[in-house]
Every structure is written in C-alpha cells, then in structure tokens.
A protein has these predicted regions:
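An N-terminal hydrophobic leader/cap segment in hydrolases
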Residues: 1-10, 120-122, 127
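Short coil-to-helix leader/linker segments, especially the first N-terminal amphipathic alpha-helix
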Residues: 5-18, 42-43, 142-153
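Short amphipathic alpha-helical surface micro-motifs
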Residues: 1-4, 43-47, 104-105, 129-130, ...
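A generic short-segment signal for beta-strand/edge and adjacent turn/coil regions
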Residues: 3-7, 30-34, 90, 137-144
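Serine-hydrolase catalytic machinery in alpha/beta-hydrolase-like enzymes
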Residues: 12-28, 32-115
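Primarily recognizes the serine-hydrolase "nucleophile elbow" in alpha/beta-hydrolase
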Residues: 118-157
Length: 157
C-alpha cells in the first residue's frame, strides 16, 4: 500500500444542537443573576436542574446545560442514556464547544432581557468542574463565581 497519497485527519464542520433547560422565577425582572448548571459524566440536564434549584437563591434564573456526547449506561433494570462533555480524541475541541455553548447561552439570555451579565455563576459537578474552571480562566471577566462539587482544577492550569 502506498502511504504517500494518504491524507489523514481531514475534517468537515457540522452543526449540532445543544440542549438546555431553563428555569425563570416569577420574580425575574430582566436583571436576574444566572446560575449555569453543568452536569457530570453520565448524567443529564434534568438531574443538574434539580440540584441547582436546591442550592440557588430564589431570584436566580437557572440554565441547566447538557453535554453533547451521549452514551448508554447500564442500570439495574436495563440501560439509560447518559451524557458527557469530553472525548479523549481531540479533547480541546470538546473544551471549545463547552465554552461556545456557555457564551452563546449567556448572549441569548441577555438579549432576551432575562439576566444581568455582571452576575453569572457556574455550578459544576465532577467532570464539568474542570470545564467550568477552564472557562473561568479563559474568560475571567464573565463568571462572578465558580462552584465545583466533587471535581477539581485541571492539572495543566
């Protein structure tokens, strides 16, 4: 086989849909703080919304975002779908997608006059802690605080 003519790792870009759930309190007045809840590996946006609503003050708008990488997880009675944020292959692309998701979401909610851009808080569990800290170090002007549960700061930061 002649390897001279092989072109490797070519790519095309494709649009994907990124999903989130949104809780807007009745008291929201266009200047509400925003808590962005980011689930851990194998979980989903509904789980993280439940957790976020337990910890967020009553006046917070909450957006619970879902990782783009789905997989099956075995349960006692079969399987369920879980989601993750990172892949081993070209992990930097997964990180960039997470950052773009959060930036686009913040822009959308601000344009809809739901949130105050000066009061953005990130709440992550496990795998997403590293992503949220990366986001905060890359965009230090955006989050007012980062809450990490059962996760840590990536070793390369």
């Amino acid at each position: 086989m002649n390897e001279e003519n092989l072109q490797a790792d070519l790519n095309l870009s494709a649009e994907i849909k990124l999903y989130y759930d949104l809780f807007v309190p009745e008291s929201a007045a266009g200047n509400s703080p925003l808590l962005i809840a980011v689930h851990g590996y194998g979980a989903h946006k509904r789980y993280m919304m439940r957790e976020a609503r337990l910890v967020a003050p009553k006046n917070f708008v909450i957006a619970s975002v879902q990782g783009p990488h789905q997989h099956f997880r075995q349960t006692d009675d079969g399987y369920r779908i879980g989601f993750g944020w990172l892949t081993d292959h070209k992990a930097e692309e997964s990180v960039a997608l997470h950052h773009k998701f959060l930036l686009d979401l913040i822009d959308k909610l601000a344009l809809e006059n739901l949130i105050d851009r000066q009061r953005i808080f990130l709440y992550g569990f496990s795998q997403s802690c590293a992503l949220n800290f990366r986001f905060a170090f890359t965009h230090p002007q955006i989050p007012k605080a980062v809450i990490g549960v059962s996760g840590g700061i990536p070793g390369d930061l």
